[in-house]
């Protein structure tokens, strides 16, 4: 059976050309310094490149320093989340790690025996604090989004009750936080030189736009990770898999349902964006309009970049993928 990710349609102006690649090596050296990666370990190097390279798709037009910050965010996501997802910690230890990470972000201090991900988190936090300057509201939004993501990991991993997959609405409600899109958006706000009024980010349309994009990113991630998760016996939390069981349909029909869902959220987002732009006060200078467009472009790039990155990453590509665009190599 051959499915195509190109069945998913986005507006043409959401397309992107990825940023340059040299930051990946820079962030890798940081990972070695902070104890996230083991020296001269090819598996670590491959994992790092696969995950951190996503930043060049999410932030295709930023300078090197900001691209590094995006890479650090991806490095933190991957190393902290995969540790909890791997099942190597019991519930008590997992909760302890979550609470420790919350303190790193909220208080800006490390525990006495810091882990590599905690060191990465503190470095990124301190960079954001310096870049924000007087923009305490921006900094607080970034910290809040990171804490919310950290706090979502354990609840999402517990969402299966009695071995049953959740309803798609419950799944989407939890996953839109757990996917990690919100910290990407608030980090993008940190990157601004900032000529915008802070009330913009409290607009309910803006918040709903973020939610719609997060759900689309989630669904794209579920599509591209389908084969890997099924092979790892983790398909119960993948809607492409559990739609087949819940609705008694085959893979092709399950994919059609996923595409229909994505189409709905993309269309709803476009309507919200149009309303959001109509409600904004008149721009005082061209920089304000540029910064609004910069934020909107980032939302667009989160989903188009996710799909583009997924078509080439060894993390998900495989000769036996159900998606023709992903029938390539896979990492060992």
Curated annotation (Swiss-Prot):
Any GO molecular function: terpene synthase activity
Q: Which InterPro entries match?
A: Isoprenoid_synthase_dom_sf, Terpene_cyclase-like_2
Asked if Metal-binding is a keyword of the record, the answer is yes
Keyword annotations for this protein, in alphabetical order, are: Lyase, Metal-binding
Q: Does the keyword Disulfide bond apply?
A: no
A GO BP term here is: terpene biosynthetic process
Q: What class of enzyme is it?
A: lyase
Name the Pfam families on file: Terpene_syn_C_2
Q: Which domain of life is it from?
A: Eukaryota
What EC number(s) is this enzyme filed under? 4.2.3.160
Short motif NDxxSxxxD/E motif, span: 221-229
**Any notes on this protein's domains?**
Contains several highly conserved motifs that are important for catalytic activity including the aspartate-rich 'DDxx(x)D/E' motif and the 'NDxxSxxxD/E' motif, both of which are involved in complexing metal ions to coordinate the binding of the isoprenyl diphosphate substrate in the active site.
Q: What is the recorded function of this protein according to its Swiss-Prot or TrEMBL entry?
A: Terpene synthase that converts its substrate farnesyl diphosphate (FPP) into the sesquiterpene protoillud-7-ene.
Concerning its family, UniProt says: Belongs to the terpene synthase family.
Instruction: Please state what the protein is called.
Output: Terpene synthase 1
Which organism is this entry from? Acytostelium subglobosum
Identify the taxonomic lineage of the organism of origin.
Answer: Eukaryota, Amoebozoa, Evosea, Eumycetozoa, Dictyostelia
Per the record, the gene is TPS1
């Amino acid at each position: 059976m051959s499915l195509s990710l190109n069945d998913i349609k986005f507006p043409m102006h959401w397309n992107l050309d990825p940023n340059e690649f040299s930051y990946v090596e820079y962030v890798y050296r940081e990972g070695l310094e902070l104890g996230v990666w083991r020296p001269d370990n090819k598996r670590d190097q491959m994992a790092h490149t696969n995950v951190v390279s996503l930043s060049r798709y999410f932030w295709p037009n930023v300078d090197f320093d900001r691209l590094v910050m995006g890479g650090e965010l991806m490095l933190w996501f991957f190393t902290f989340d995969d540790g909890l997802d791997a099942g190597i910690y019991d519930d008590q230890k997992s909760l302890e790690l979550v609470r420790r990470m919350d303190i790193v972000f909220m208080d800006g201090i490390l525990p006495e025996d810091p882990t590599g991900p905690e060191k990465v988190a503190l470095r990124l936090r301190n960079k954001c604090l310096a870049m924000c300057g007087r923009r305490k509201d921006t900094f607080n939004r970034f910290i809040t989004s990171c804490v919310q993501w950290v706090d979502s990991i354990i609840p999402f991993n517990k969402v299966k009750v009695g071995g049953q997959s959740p309803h798609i609405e419950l799944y989407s409600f939890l996953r839109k936080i757990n996917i990690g899109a919100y910290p990407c958006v608030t980090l993008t706000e940190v990157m601004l030189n900032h000529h915008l009024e802070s009330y913009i980010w409290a607009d309910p349309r803006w918040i709903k736009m973020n939610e719609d994009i997060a759900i689309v990113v989630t669904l794209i991630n579920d599509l591209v990770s389908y084969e890997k998760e099924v092979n790892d016996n983790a398909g119960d939390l993948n809607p492409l898999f559990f739609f087949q069981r819940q609705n008694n349909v085959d893979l092709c029909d399950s994919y059609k349902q996923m595409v229909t869902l994505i189409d709905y959220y993309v269309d709803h987002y476009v309507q919200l964006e149009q309303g959001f732009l109509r409600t904004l006060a008149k721009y005082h200078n061209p920089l304000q309009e540029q910064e609004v467009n910069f934020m909107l472009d980032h939302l667009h790039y989160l989903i188009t970049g996710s799909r583009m990155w997924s078509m080439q990453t060894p993390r998900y590509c495989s000769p036996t993928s159900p998606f023709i665009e992903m029938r390539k190599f896979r990492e060992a």
